Each structure stands twice: as C-alpha cells, then as structure tokens.
Amino acid sequence: FPDLILGWAQERDLNPLLVTALVRQESRFQPNIKSVVGAVGLMQVMPETGEWISTQLGQDSYSLTQPADNVKFGTWYLDFTHREYSNNSLFAVASYNAGPGAVSRWIEEKKFTNADEFVDKIPYPETKGYVESVFGGYWNYLRSYDPAVRARVDAL
C-alpha cells in the first residue's frame, strides 16, 4: 500500500514514514483486520470515528474495509490530531490511540516540559506502548529511507 500511504500523506502534509509506522503498528499492513474493540482496516479506524470523518469530508459512501477509504480517513484523522496539537507528532500519535480528550487532559495536568517526560508519564499502558512502538518504527524507517538521517547516523 505504499502508493496509497504516500499519496494521502502528501495530500495531508504528513510524513509518509510516520504514517507507515502507524499503519504497521495498527494493522501490520493487513487491510481486513478488525480489532476486538471494533477498529477496522489498515489504520484501525473506529466506525464511529469513520462516521464523523465522513461528515467532515462530505463523503456519504465509504467502506473502512477498503484500503483507499481507510487510509483516506485515517490520514485525515491523524492530520486532525496534528492540528489539535500544533503539529506535535508525539501528541498527535498519542491522541490517535487514546483520543484527543485524554491527551489534552494529560498535558494540562502534567505540564510536560519535554517529549521523554511525556512518554514516560502516559497513564494508559496501551498508549505508552503504542507511542513507543510507532516512534520506534518511524525512527527505523527514517534511518532506512531518509538520506539526510542516514548520513547523520553513518557519521556518528
């Protein structure tokens, strides 16, 4: 699904390697997977979230089991979470998993001063592991596919 991910990531001004890392964590690239809580497809979009996104996009007809719709909706939501948190990918990814209300509450209550502190103090174990996994995958993709990052790593 690289062309699909790249196309929607570029359309939404998201880093395609971050989106790829998120898809890997969410579904292991299995387009028909469904979670025990009901999330669907490559980007594990919840049906209720999909309904809300469809109204935001003005798209009445869609199927979250179809990779094209799922990635379109999932990247829209990831872009939404980025806009909610001033383009902070760490907060956006945590919000993608835990919901924007939870992340806003954590930020307000904890007054985080750096990214490591935020990750260490995420109160939901699932979300903490999710953020660590997505960003671990993202870092590996950056090292493998981003020439600037690869050059800096090789220079160490």
Residue ranges: model-predicted function:
Residues F1-L156:
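Catalytic glycan-binding domains that act on GlcNAc-containing polysaccharides
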